[in-house]
Amino acid sequence: MTIPSFAIGIAGGTGAGKTTVAREITDNVGESATLIPLDNYYEDLSDRPFEERANANYDHPSAFEWELLRTHIDALLSGQSIEMPQYDFERHVRKADRVVVEPTDVIVLEGILALSDETVNDMLDLHIYVETDADVRILRRIERDVVERGRELEGVMDQYLSTVKPMHEQFIEPTKRHADIIIPEGANSVAVNLLEEKVQAETSEMTAWAARDDTAFEDATYNPQ
């Protein structure tokens, strides 16, 4: 089964407000939207010692299992369900449990490098980059990693200076050139509202298209005796 899906990619630096924008879109669309966090597709490093996993560079494109992500997005766009991996940020390993995700009208891929893979970009209908001042982003990163993910402040700061900041400059910020829309100041309410209106318009158009397609199919196959 193929369903008309509208795929959105939301990228930006750590702490830029990507998740907020993604959640506002999915909440606005409701059950017709699926959120795919890129973080869930980190390579599984469970075969390595904890210290090595803790010091790995998670902001480099090679940290992600792109082939699996491509396969999953393609499946969703083809109307097939997927088993999405889950990631343990405290232990830096992929969890054994997976979450079954069904295809929906809107698919939202969110993550620092959501716009970095050429094949994935070709699957997306709308490319968004969330841009926020670096000072604001590091404060949000600290709050998220220390409060939400249970990490030590010193480790978070060391990681930011050694990998997060240089990787942002080298790999993440350049993906802005792929963006159809750049949202300034993180979750800028005006920009997000306009974005939500666009998504709603796209989904309404897809619903109408699907209804016309179903009617055409019924007319073509109806053969009264």
From Swiss-Prot:
Gene3D superfamilies: P-loop containing nucleotide triphosphate hydrolases. The gene is udk. The lineage of its organism: Archaea, Methanobacteriati, Methanobacteriota, Stenosarchaea group, Halobacteria. It is found in: Cytoplasm. It is an enzyme of class 2 (transferase). One of its GO terms (biological process) is UMP salvage. InterPro entries: P-loop_NTPase, PRK/URK, Uridine_kinase, Uridine_kinase-like. It comes from the Archaea. One of its GO terms (cellular component) is cytoplasm. Pathway: Pyrimidine metabolism; CTP biosynthesis via salvage pathway; CTP from cytidine: step 1/3; Pyrimidine metabolism; UMP biosynthesis via salvage pathway; UMP from uridine: step 1/1. This is Uridine kinase. Its EC number is 2.7.1.48. Belongs to the uridine kinase family. NCBIfam families: PRK05480.1, udk. ATP binds at residues 12-19. Its main location: cytoplasm. Keywords: ATP-binding, Cytoplasm, Kinase, Nucleotide-binding, Transferase. It catalyses: uridine + ATP = UMP + ADP + H(+); cytidine + ATP = CMP + ADP + H(+). GO terms for molecular function: ATP binding; cytidine kinase activity; uridine kinase activity.
